[in-house]
């Protein structure tokens, strides 16, 4: 067996993988939780995906080194705010290490739980945490959506592509 065929050795390095994944457009989200002391935590995430329809499940990837990791991994519930094109500023702030991520005043507290969310987002999912799975240098947090709030469906989404924010441009007329 050659070194390249060794299953214990990664086939590509982290930078090559990062460069390749920069070609994959992903929706921009802000994920928020409350910690055990009631403090708000939030971070911008591009690694949020639908995992299952029955039962409904979403997955949020969070780096083990993230300042929000401990709170996110321990939270009983979390909110995923799917951002629109007009929410670049909050996306940038929530992605900035050391920033006061809640300084802009855009966040509200979910009734009955207090978990912060962005009421002007395209969609907000309030999720109950069902599992946390270690995957390399990240934890994958699985959650069941228990409530969904939708905003303006005509608002274009905010996407992350090639290490920058983008908004899709329709190539065909919208269907009525």
From Swiss-Prot:
<dbReference type="GO" id="GO:0010181">
    <property type="term" value="F:FMN binding"/>
</dbReference>
<protein>
    <recommendedName>
        <fullName>NADH:riboflavin 5'-phosphate oxidoreductase</fullName>
    </recommendedName>
</protein>
<comment type="function">
    <text>Provides the reduced form of flavin mononucleotide for the PIIA synthase reaction.</text>
</comment>
<dbReference type="InterPro" id="IPR012349">
    <property type="entry name" value="Split_barrel_FMN-bd"/>
</dbReference>
<dbReference type="InterPro" id="IPR050268">
    <property type="entry name" value="NADH-dep_flavin_reductase"/>
</dbReference>
<dbReference type="InterPro" id="IPR002563">
    <property type="entry name" value="Flavin_Rdtase-like_dom"/>
</dbReference>
<dbReference type="GO" id="GO:0006208">
    <property type="term" value="P:pyrimidine nucleobase catabolic process"/>
</dbReference>
<dbReference type="GO" id="GO:0042602">
    <property type="term" value="F:riboflavin reductase (NADPH) activity"/>
</dbReference>
<dbReference type="Pfam" id="PF01613">
    <property type="entry name" value="Flavin_Reduct"/>
</dbReference>
<keyword id="KW-0560">Oxidoreductase</keyword>
């Amino acid at each position: 067996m050659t070194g390249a065929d060794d299953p214990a050795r990664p086939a590509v390095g982290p930078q090559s993988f990062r460069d390749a994944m920069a070609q994959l457009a992903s929706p921009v989200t802000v994920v928020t939780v409350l910690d055990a002391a009631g403090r708000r935590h939030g971070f911008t995430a591009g690694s949020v995906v639908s995992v299952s329809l029955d039962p409904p499940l979403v997955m949020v990837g969070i780096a083990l080194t993230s300042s929000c990791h401990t709170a996110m991994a321990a939270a009983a519930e979390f909110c995923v705010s799917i951002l629109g094109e007009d929410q670049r500023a909050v996306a940038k702030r929530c992605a900035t290490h050391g920033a006061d991520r809640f300084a802009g005043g855009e966040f509200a507290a979910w009734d009955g739980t207090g978990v912060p969310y962005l009421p002007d987002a395209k969609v907000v999912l309030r999720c109950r945490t069902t599992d946390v799975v270690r995957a390399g240098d990240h934890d994958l947090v699985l959650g069941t959506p228990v409530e969904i709030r939708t905003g303006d469906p005509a608002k274009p989404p905010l996407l992350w592509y090639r290490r920058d924010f983008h908004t899709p441009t329709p190539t065909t007329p919208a269907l009525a």
